[in-house]
Every structure is written in structure tokens, then in C-alpha cells.
């Protein structure tokens, strides 16, 4: 009877070891679950970004307002008759930073 109990304890220990540390065990399950949650969060962020990009594409396809806005903001275009003022931030010495745009005469 003692030998039978000892054999059962060894078998139980082996099964527990396999459950906790073996392939597809609880430790690996926890790691895979955490990885899955991270991937789902990344996918959600990417889906939101894709939606914004799709909206931008539709705006660009449908009207000139979005194109005009991009040209004004990114390329510095101005309409004829407008006056453009650029406000430069101050650097750490308290002086205005110089613009990288060439001066026009």
C-alpha cells in the first residue's frame, strides 16, 4: 500500500509539473494571454489610425478644402492678397529662433 501511494504521488507530481511548466502549461498560457492583450491593443490603435487616414483620403477625393488646408499648413502656401506672419518661438537664451525659410525681397 505504501508503494502504491508513493507511485501515485510521483505520478501526481509529474502531472503537476507538466501542467505548470510543460508545453501549453499555465506559465506559457499566461505569457500567450498577455501577448494577445498587447497585440489587441496595438491592433485597436492601428484600426483607429486607419480610420483617420481613410477619412483624410475621402476628404482629399471629395473637395478642394482639404487640399488647400494641406498646402497651407505643410507647404506654407498663401492666397494672393493675403499677408503671412510667422511667429517664431523663443529659444533658451530668450531670442527668437531664426526661420529656416530663405528671405524674399
UniProtKB/Swiss-Prot annotation:
Topological domains annotated Cytoplasmic: 1-3
UniProt membrane topology term: Single-pass type II membrane protein
Coiled-coil region: 28-74
GO terms, biological process: FtsZ-dependent cytokinesis
UniProt cross-references to Pfam families, sorted A to Z: DivIC
One cellular component term from this protein's GO annotations in UniProt: cell septum
Entry's transmembrane regions: 4-21
Periplasmic side: 22-105
Record family assignment: Belongs to the FtsB family.
HAMAP family reported in the protein's UniProt record: FtsB
Protein task: Essential cell division protein. May link together the upstream cell division proteins, which are predominantly cytoplasmic, with the downstream cell division proteins, which are predominantly periplasmic.
Name of this chain's protein: Cell division protein FtsB
Gene from which this protein is expressed: ftsB
Amino acid at each position: 500500500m505504501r508503494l502504491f501511494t508513493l507511485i501515485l504521488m510521483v505520478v501526481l507530481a509529474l502531472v503537476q509539473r507538466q501542467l505548470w511548466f510543460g508545453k501549453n502549461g499555465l506559465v506559457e498560457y499566461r505569457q500567450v494571454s498577455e501577448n494577445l492583450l498587447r497585440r489587441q491593443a496595438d491592433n485597436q490603435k492601428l484600426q483607429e489610425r486607419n480610420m483617420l487616414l481613410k477619412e483624410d483620403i475621402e476628404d482629399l477625393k471629395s473637395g478642394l478644402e482639404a487640399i488647400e488646408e494641406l498646402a497651407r499648413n505643410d507647404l506654407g502656401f498663401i492666397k494672393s492678397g493675403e499677408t503671412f506672419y510667422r511667429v517664431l518661438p523663443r529659444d533658451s537664451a530668450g531670442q527668437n529662433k531664426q526661420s529656416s525659410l530663405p528671405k524674399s525681397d
